Amino acid sequence: MTLDYPVPFHTPNLVWDSTIAIYLFLLGISSGAVQLAIAYKRSHKLENPSKNWIIRAAAVLGSVPTLIGLTLLIFHLARPWTFWKLMFNYQFNSVMSMGVMLFQVYMLFLVCWCAVIFKEDIMALIQRFIPKLGFVGKIINVLERLTGPVEVILFILAAVLGAYTGFLLSALISYPMLNNPVLPALFLASGTSSGIAATFLFILIAGKLKGDSHESHFIHKFEVPIMVTELGLLICFFVGLHFGGGQKVVALHNALSGFWGAVFWIGVFLIGIIIPLLANLAAKDSLKYNKNFIILVSIFDLIGVLCLRYFILYAGQLTVA
């Protein structure tokens, strides 16, 4: 059965709205930026990691988007003032509750990792403003000896966080398009892509690095493989719907037609994947490592990932099993 209502953001079966789409988008940026930074740090012998802009980007992009996303989630609750119950009363049969627990553990390890890296800066601030907290230095010294395990665990948690955004939607079993096993992998790949794009913007704009810097060359290694992976997972996602029969075929038709079809083909496929992919494959090195060119491609990438979150969330709720 095809749809007979034209309003894209207000459909009869809508459970989750744009707040959740933005929440998923922000978590993806955090996940991707942290994975990239840990990969960079472990593949380079950095004398002072706190001065490296990829590491700095992870400290900001890993924490700020996640906290903003959590704030949005809190105010999305029917009773926001009861959020503390969600934070400390875990329900192991609730995907949302498990996500909150994952967020807490992830933030704990991220804070520990950042504390070790920015130890000198933190201790300088403590000695200047709050000398009584000098004991924090001893705690950081202990964490410093555990840097290796902390980084490995944080990398795994970041990857799980990226995949969790897909698990969250796939838990809506009454929606054929969302109840799809490919979603976690797709959201992990697209989240990593958005983390890479956000890191590029951070190091080039805030860090004022050159387009042909060592950091830029390192990040470029991951762009094309991630985009190709994302494209492949999208194909698997739609092929699964096509051969799923029944309401899955209806869900596919409804999703790729009308307003949300345009969002996918223009926002996700063209702006988010094809243009950045061709730009990386076809551009000469003089253009590929041009600062303004990288910024433009990164913006396209972020637009595409945001459109994908909106498309999956809203188009996925158009059809009920």
Please provide the spans of the model-predicted regions:
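Long, contiguous internal "core" modules enriched in hydrophobic/ aromatic residues
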Residues: L24-I29, S43-K45, F109-L287
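Aromatic-anchored segments of alpha-helical transmembrane domains
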Residues: L233, D301-L308
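Membrane-interface interhelical loops and short amphipathic "cap" helices
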Residues: M1-I20, P49, F75-S97, G166-L186, ...
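Membrane helical hairpin/interfacial module
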Residues: L27-F109
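Interfacial loop-to-transmembrane junctions
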Residues: N280-G304
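Transmembrane alpha-helical segments of multi-pass membrane transport proteins and ion-pumping complexes
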Residues: A33, A37, I196, F200, ...
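Alpha-helical transmembrane segments and their helix-start/interface "positive-inside/aromatic belt" motifs
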Residues: D17-A21, N48-S63, S97-L102, E144-V152, ...
